Amino acid sequence: MTIFDNYEVWFVIGSQHLYGPETLRQVTQHAEHVVNALNTEAKLPCKLVLKPLGTTPDEITAICRDANYDDRCAGLVVWLHTFSPAKMWINGLTMLNKPLLQFHTQFNAALPWDSIDMDFMNLNQTAHGGREFSFIGARMRQQHAVVTGHWQDKQAHERIGSWMRQAVSKQDTRHLKVCRFGDNMREVAVTDGDKVAAQIKFGFSVNTWAVGDLVQVVNSISDGDVNALVDEYESCYTMTPATQIHGEKRQNVLEAARIELGMKRFLEQGGFHAFTTTFEDLHGLKQLPGLAVQRLMQQGYGFAGEGDWKTAALLRIMKVMSTGLQGGTSFMEDYTYHFEKGNDLVLGSHMLEVCPSIAAEEKPILDVQHLGIGGKDDPARLIFNTQTGPAIVASLIDLGDRYRLLVNCIDTVKTPHSLPKLPVANALWKAQPDLPTASEAWILAGGAHHTVFSHALNLNDMRQFAEMHDIEITVIDNDTRLPAFKDALRWNEVYYGFRR
């Protein structure tokens, strides 16, 4: 059972009565065949549901209205099998508030050269029916995705599946509640922002809860539940001597388990799926939540440190998008550099909170070590290196008049040396196109020091996310050149300025 089982995508066929009942019967027959095949063979993340043909303005309006009010409907896939006059779609598309994808396909793959006649031409009109539909989308300035390809083509399947992930994620985001335990880290700018504007733009709400309220729940957790969770730790992780039974830091592990259970209970009771903490606001907690946060992220919760609610929300969104895909997704921070001619590297980490979904090791190390910040007991944490391969880091920032999503494509590499004194999980990567260009572009665009790191998602996923939410995206990859990047920032300033 995944979040995608809670949603469905409606498959809508556009046509008209001009062609007569026999043509419409064939259109319906083709649509049923295509939907059944896609549900069976395309490995789509959620189910396609065929709706009745849209052949009149009233029918189309009813479909769009029903989609808006059906909580299970994540979006619409529209196929213009025949020509469908686009004025029929205006009222429905005007009210539609769900994501829309135009599937530019046709039932047959090859033309029947010897038998093709006007009946065939009238039945299979995607080539120009799709253009009529696309005009009204452009005329109405309505954002929608387009996938072209035969319905049996695997690349088309992948692109539809990727869009479905975005559509489901958008619906989940509309219900997302972010809990901030304490406030923003004092005097920090980029982690702050306009929470009202964020709720208007994305749909997620952000509210603060006193740490004392959390502490009350943590203290209510029974010793039996704590011991059961620690037994789970014993089976999942490599325990250091200090954390084992009779070890000098065993009590810290027990306390970390109590915090995890308390946090999870608090989040479940409040319906929260993302949260933040800050080391400056830990009153009543015996240690900074480290292990608890890591394990909650692995269960799908969004998180960011120092009150950074934008990154916490973005992590949850990307966790939903990547559900079931290979590779993990985590809170991350560009921490320090390795400058070496031709081999510049970035070491990413955080004080404690890196998600084990990106771990290279099957059983990360569970340890308790000193943390010289926060003024509390030594916290428990999982220590591991990260899987290698292509990845992205993404940052969502508030520019006042708009949101900007920054994405840097990176290549994670194996740590060339052991890190015996580094008591935290880490990731090591090469930034594309190179560290000087990537860091300068990131800084020029105002990118945050907190990011979401993902092996599971790619640049195309984040482009779709930005388009679906109608926000700016700036990309740093192997094609980036600083003069052109600076020009793009200037052009975006003008473009979004005109849209205010």
Swiss-Prot record:
GO terms, molecular function: L-arabinose isomerase activity; manganese ion binding
Name of the protein described by the UniProt record: L-arabinose isomerase
Record's cofactor remark: Binds 1 Mn(2+) ion per subunit.
EC number annotated for this UniProt entry: 5.3.1.4
Entry's family note: Belongs to the arabinose isomerase family.
Needed cofactors: Mn(2+)
Residue sites binding Mn(2+) per the record: E306, E333, H350, H450
Regions annotated as coiled coil: none
Catalytic reaction equation(s): beta-L-arabinopyranose = L-ribulose
Pathway the protein contributes to: Carbohydrate degradation; L-arabinose degradation via L-ribulose; D-xylulose 5-phosphate from L-arabinose (bacterial route): step 1/3
Quaternary structure, from the entry: Homohexamer.
Task performed by this protein: Catalyzes the conversion of L-arabinose to L-ribulose.
CC terms in the record's Gene Ontology section: cytosol
Keywords: Arabinose catabolism, Carbohydrate metabolism, Isomerase, Manganese, Metal-binding
Swiss-Prot/TrEMBL GO biological process terms: L-arabinose catabolic process to xylulose 5-phosphate
